[in-house]
């Protein structure tokens, strides 16, 4: 009961924290560790980076209405992550030619642990976590309006 109340009351903060960690992590890996960024990675970043600002402001203002704007970005980022992960993990997966000649190929694995955790996998995980917290925020909004 206490965990449920904690999740409902602070779900926007947890979603914002997840977006912040994902943003800072991707910036660290590209700017400090110099891991090359492919086009699909950029598309994922376009979906995640604005969430850091949107969710931060919404959490500060306790504006749960942001869910209807943030969730589509999260879902789109998830789809880009899944597509890139499939390109990396399934040999012969026919990629759509989104990658330009100057950027690294999207199917290249530049960082991997345990044989299956790659950067797109972490992107999928972050978007799933954000989706969970945003859905919790949405349902707590419905209950508050009903009371």
UniProtKB/Swiss-Prot annotation:
Transmembrane segments: 9-28, 43-62, 69-86, 115-139
InterPro entries (alphabetical): DiS_bond_form_DsbB/BdbC, Disulphide_bond_form_BdbC, DsbB-like_sf
Protein name, UniProt field: Probable disulfide formation protein
Top-level taxon: Bacteria
Keywords: Cell inner membrane, Cell membrane, Chaperone, Disulfide bond, Electron transport, Membrane, Oxidoreductase, Redox-active center, Transmembrane, Transmembrane helix, Transport
Keyword match Ubl conjugation: no
Database matches in PANTHER family: DISULFIDE FORMATION PROTEIN-RELATED, SPBETA PROPHAGE-DERIVED DISULFIDE BOND FORMATION PROTEIN B
Functional note: Required for disulfide bond formation in some proteins.
Primary location: membrane
Family from the record: Belongs to the DsbB family. BdbC subfamily.
Listed GO CC annotations: plasma membrane
SS bond list: 38-41, 99-106
MF (Gene Ontology): protein-disulfide reductase activity
Keyword Transit peptide: no
Gene3D superfamilies hit by this protein: DsbB-like
GO biological process, one term: protein folding
Entry membrane topology: Multi-pass membrane protein
Entry's localization field: Cell inner membrane
Source lineage: Bacteria, Pseudomonadati, Pseudomonadota, Gammaproteobacteria, Legionellales
